[in-house]
């Protein structure tokens, strides 16, 4: 009963990822991912937010990402997707928070998890795309994400087992930062 809805959601997520990945050069912003500081380096409320929200978003995901994506919108619930191989099966797993974590009281946010089995070729293709994107993480201009919009986080693990993570900020349409 839920399989068609899950597949439709997963297809939308994959399509958005591919579109976002290939549109980096088309945007008037930087065309590479920026490095991500370790979440443990943030202090105070922001540090607590990052550690808590990523802990929730990674619920049920493998410790080391093959290909993982997380989105942190300013005013709507955070969500993540992981491409994984478990028990010989290839799956896309998505986690969506029940509400925006930043505005919620502690302990009130739950995780809605959905998963779908994918083909080995899609698994390998998504892994290749994520590795290509995360290998190009640069900090050339020291720019940083703004306050409004969505920050997208991409992570993957290379053949040597090294985890790479980068982020891309996408300002809200119609704002001065988007122009």
Annotate each predicted stretch with a short phrase.
Residues 29-179:
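Function-determining sites in protein domains
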Residues 1-32:
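Bacterial Sec-dependent N-terminal signal peptides
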């Amino acid at each position: 009963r839920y399989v068609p809805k899950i597949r439709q959601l997963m297809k939308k997520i994959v399509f958005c990822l591919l579109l976002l990945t290939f549109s980096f050069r088309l945007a008037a912003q930087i065309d590479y991912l920026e490095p991500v500081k370790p979440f443990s380096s943030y202090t105070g409320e922001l540090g607590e937010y990052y550690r808590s929200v990523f802990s929730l978003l990674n619920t049920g995901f493998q410790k080391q990402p093959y290909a993982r994506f997380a989105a942190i919108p300013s005013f709507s619930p955070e969500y993540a997707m992981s491409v994984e191989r478990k028990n010989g099966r290839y799956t896309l797993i998505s986690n969506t928070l029940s509400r925006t974590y930043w505005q919620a009281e502690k302990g009130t946010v739950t995780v809605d998890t959905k998963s779908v089995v994918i083909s080995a070729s899609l698994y390998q293709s998504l892994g290749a795309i994520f590795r290509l994107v995360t290998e190009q993480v640069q900090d050339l201009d020291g720019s940083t994400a703004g306050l409004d919009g969505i920050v997208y986080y991409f992570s993957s693990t290379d053949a040597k087992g090294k985890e790479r993570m980068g982020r891309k900020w996408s300002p809200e349409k119609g704002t001065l930062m988007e122009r």
